[in-house]
Amino acid sequence: IIRAETIESMRILGVPKETIIYKDLPNVLLNDIPMHTVIKVVHDVIESVQPDVLYVPFMYDLHKDHREVLYAAQVAARTCTPTGRKIKEIYMYETLSETHWNVDHTEGGFLPNVFNNIEDYIEKKVEAVQAYKSQLKTYPDVRCVEAIRALALFRGSVMGMEHAEAFVLVRLLQ
């Protein structure tokens, strides 16, 4: 179901289906397989795609898979490797259903320092998120359209714009 929803969401955003990369890793069970396997999968994707910019989950997301993916990406993107040196920017993003459910006083809270203006894209973002029918809930659940709009509105208001997405800068090589 998730794969079909991803394809539909990416179609809405204008991402060609053939550019979507899937790997057969267990959902919600990444910590059940050896970390070196996850690192290799992430490294191979990075090496294949050769991105300049990498977006990764927030380090203290409650979802363990998010933490595993972040760790694997950090290892794969180390600047001591040719593959890692090609990545000039790394940003951690917030996930409504995971980032703010951690225990802020024992782990760091999400304190963004980069904001992208999405005033022209908020409706497209909402439409793309709505493609994930199996994941979307109704208000007041955090996985609802109203929460997505509210977060974009809040992040935008912090920077004096209508809507924004917020990130934590991890790396900026200039």
Model regions: which residues?
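Active-site beta-strand->loop->alpha-helix modules in alpha/beta enzyme cores, enriched
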Residues: I1-K86, M92, Q135, A150-L151, ...
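The feature marks non-catalytic terminal segments
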Residues: E5-K17, K86-Q174
